[in-house]
Amino acid sequence: MLRFLSFGSGSSGNCYLLYTDTDCLMIDCGVGIRSLKKHFHNYGLQLNMVHNVLITHDHADHVKSVGSISGDLQLPVYTTEDVHRGLSQNWCVRRKVDQQYVKFVQKGEEITIGEFKVTPFGVPHDSTDCVGYSVEYEGIRFTLITDCGHITDEIALFISISNYLVIEANHEPEKLAAGPYPRHLKERISGPNGHLSNEACAKALVENASPALRHVWLCHLSDENNHPELAKKTIEAVLRDSGIIIGKEFTLEVLKRKIPSEMYELNP
């Protein structure tokens, strides 16, 4: 049985868990190590069940605890060479990943990590480098796309073959435009290497979701420029106008910024 948990999704910290009875992948590690230990305990899980870590990019809200968990548990950390370079230079990562645990991935090349087949793919974002991950386990395909400025053809392909999808819905353009952020930050967020809006997320689903898609989680919502109900309502409306009925075609939920999700069982 494949299971999924979110321990945090947003600028305050991102961390996701994909696991079976005998193997466990952590995707990003931007939640504090004390909070992680508490979350694992609350779910009746052990931190040492994690066998490998995947990192999407080197911004602090995705990596601040990766050196600690890797060093304490002797965990390999997989990401691109450029992201690893960014990690080694990131002052927010106080404890660096020891060289013996540094593992490189190549975009577009599938690798086997424990029980999982993992394919990293490029994601446009203004970090040193950025990737999403598509993970296959016993015929189930789970894909995570976060911190994404725009949808590329490659990203569209992975959406189209996914059964379970975590995808960014960061902001509502009108709230961003009217909000308190300085102009340069608004332009960064809304730019081609920034973050997906609710509308851009909805468009990606309309254009690429297949009948195989069962469940979608919206991730990395802005606290200032979005709201869970607004994101879900906006995306549901766009989907409905295109003939896609939530609950009939697939399920849609929002991952909370600071509160862990429920534990989801991902069925074939």
Predicted regions located by residue number:
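Active-site environment of divalent metal-dependent phosphoester hydrolases
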Residues: S12, A60-V63, R85-G86, T128, ...
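Metallo-beta-lactamase
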Residues: E81-G132, E136-G139
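Active-site neighborhood of phospho(di)ester-bond hydrolases with catalytic His/Asp-centered motifs
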Residues: M26-G30, V50-D58, Y78-E81, T143-T146, ...
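Metal-dependent catalytic neighborhoods of phosphoester/phosphodiester hydrolases
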Residues: K64-L73, S88-W91, N226-K233
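Conserved beta-strand hairpin/beta-sheet module of binuclear metal-dependent hydrolase folds
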Residues: M1-Y43, V131-D147, Y164
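Active-site metal-binding motif and surrounding structural segment of the metallo-beta-lactamase
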Residues: I33-T80
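Cap/insert and terminal regions of metallo-dependent hydrolase folds
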Residues: D153-T251
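Structured catalytic core of nucleotide-sugar glycosyltransferases
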Residues: L5-C15, D58-H62, V66, P120
